[in-house]
Regions:
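Extended catalytic cores of very large enzyme megasubunits
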Residues: 1-291
Length: 291
């Protein structure tokens, strides 16, 4: 524990410098050691070389409302950096995704997947754009390090190419099933959950997700109903919540609570986004007014 704390303090010295006095550094260090205060757990984990390479790994929580195909890779990248990712598959977002063209039989040259976070994300974006355009592409995974290989910077062990292969095959299947149409909210949710399932290192779950959906989205309401973990196990990586901004009727709320009870999973939750303005911290409100 003391080594972890010292690594964190050392990294913060690199960035904060003399903005804190030696007495303040010592006070912060002691507070963390005694667990009286706690900094970002992600930064506690990745302070040092990992955070120097990309400071995204320092953040506990992130959020993406997918409205373009690149957003799926953004969610993947954030998850691979160890961040928790919230996403909204509300119809107002998913309906902005383009219409899927019917397959033309045209095939692109084989794409070699690079052995990096960016390489995996680029492969996903290429696949989605290709399938949306009515074309197809084959991927070469020969550059991806094998399962069990040591991850020197982030720690842990590599999962090998199989999770990415499964993700790309699954995404292709869901996209091609909607040729001539658009992805449904449940389709987008499932692809993102499959991304979460893909982001695994050495058998350790590194994905934390929350999915927001429309209150009247019945498919999302029933996404974790019954033995979903047998038919759609990837859905386990995300907690699901319905979101509303205008007060629902008693009947609407009762429908949601009954569905939650019958699901057996305790989901979906319900999130009152309309009340956020009343609970927004003044310091944050003042900050956003400045920028």
């Amino acid at each position: 524990w003391v080594e972890t704390v010292d690594r964190y303090i050392s990294f913060m010295r690199e960035n904060v410098g003399d903005k804190l006095t030696e007495k303040e550094y010592a006070e912060v260090r002691l507070g963390i050691l005694k667990q009286e205060v706690m900094p970002s757990m992600r930064l506690m984990q990745f302070s040092g070389e990992a955070a120097r390479r990309c400071n995204v790994c320092a953040y506990n929580c992130t959020f993406v409302a997918p409205v373009k195909l690149e957003d799926f890779a953004e969610i993947m990248y954030l998850s691979m950096q160890g961040c928790g990712v919230g996403f909204a598959v509300e119809s107002q977002n998913i309906e902005q995704l383009p219409q899927i063209m019917k397959q033309t039989g045209q095939k692109l040259p084989t794409h070699t997947v690079l052995d990096s976070k960016e390489g995996w994300c680029d492969a996903l974006t290429l696949g989605l754009k290709t399938w949306y355009a009515g074309k197809d592409v084959t991927f070469d995974f020969s550059e991806v390090r094998p399962a069990g290989a040591r991850l020197k910077t982030m720690g842990g062990k590599a999962s090998g190419p199989e999770p990415l292969k499964n993700l790309l095959a699954y995404a292709r299947e869901r996209v091609l099933a909607r040729q001539g149409r658009r992805l449904r909210t449940i389709d987008a949710h499932d692809v993102i959950c499959k991304i979460g399932e893909c982001v695994v290192a050495g058998g350790v779950r590194r994905t934390a997700m929350i999915s927001l959906s429309d209150l009247d989205d019945v498919e999302m309401r029933d996404a974790k109903k019954g033995q979903f973990y047998m038919t759609d196990p990837h859905r386990s990586v995300a907690n699901n919540s319905a979101v509303y901004e205008v007060q629902p009727t008693n009947a609407e709320l009762m429908d949601e609570w009954v569905a939650l009870m019958k699901s057996g999973s305790g989901e979906r939750g319900i999130f009152n986004r309309g009340s956020l303005a009343k609970t927004f911290p003044k310091r944050r409100e003042d900050y956003y007014k400045k920028i």
